[in-house]
């Protein structure tokens, strides 16, 4: 209908609702020593948000040494750049529900922008419980491929950000 009327679809849906969009830059995280340097480089380039891999694969119940390592990586950025840099933490589904609840709770004082894919999509029912243990927004969706995969996430409201992989 947009082509027929010679209008962009967003105009047919009521018009533009914003003229800016916040973007983030991926900085890795598999090499913890590089995290702070990369975040500082992105900040110098004008980015005000980064996403990082702060976790390695964790056991169902793991040690607080590993939790502290995650906190240390995120805290290094927060301490160096303050609240001017938003930090998203991608779990890549490497974490089981029990550890995801602990990590989300422990990360709260560092004020992440969001946590991404705390569990794999096959375990999306765990997101409800994880969401109940944190105020941090939860993002997921890059490994979900149909509208039916997203239906319960949207209707139940326990995910704040959906990230379909359009490629």
Language-model regions, residue ranges each:
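Short acidic active-site motifs
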Residues: 99, 125-126, 148-149
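Beta/alpha (TIM)-barrel catalytic core signal, keyed to glycine-rich beta->alpha loops juxtaposed to Asp/Glu
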Residues: 145-154
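Catalytic beta/alpha-barrel core
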Residues: 51, 88, 92, 111-121, ...
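A short acidic, amphipathic alpha-helical/loop segment
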Residues: 38, 126-129, 152
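N-terminal capping/lid subdomain adjacent to the active-site entrance of alpha/beta enzymes
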Residues: 1-87, 94, 98-101, 105-109
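Glycine-enriched alpha-helix->loop->beta-strand junction motifs that scaffold or abut catalytic
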Residues: 46-48, 81-83, 105-113, 129-138, ...
């Amino acid at each position: 209908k947009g082509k027929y009327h010679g209008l962009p679809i967003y105009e047919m849906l009521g018009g533009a609702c914003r003229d800016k969009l916040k973007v983030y830059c991926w900085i890795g995280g598999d090499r913890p020593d590089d995290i702070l340097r990369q975040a500082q480089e992105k900040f110098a380039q004008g980015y005000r948000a980064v996403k990082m891999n702060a976790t390695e694969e964790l056991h169902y119940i793991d040690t607080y040494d590993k939790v502290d390592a995650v906190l240390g990586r995120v805290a290094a950025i927060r301490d160096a750049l303050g609240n001017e840099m938003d930090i998203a933490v991608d779990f890549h589904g490497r974490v089981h529900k029990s550890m995801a609840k602990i990590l989300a709770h422990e990360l709260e004082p560092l004020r992440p922008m969001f946590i991404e894919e705390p569990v794999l999509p096959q375990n999306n029912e765990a997101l409800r419980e994880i969401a109940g243990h944190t105020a941090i927004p939860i993002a997921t969706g890059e490994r979900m491929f149909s509208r039916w995969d997203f239906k319960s996430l949207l209707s139940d409201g326990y995910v704040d950000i959906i990230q379909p992989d359009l490629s």
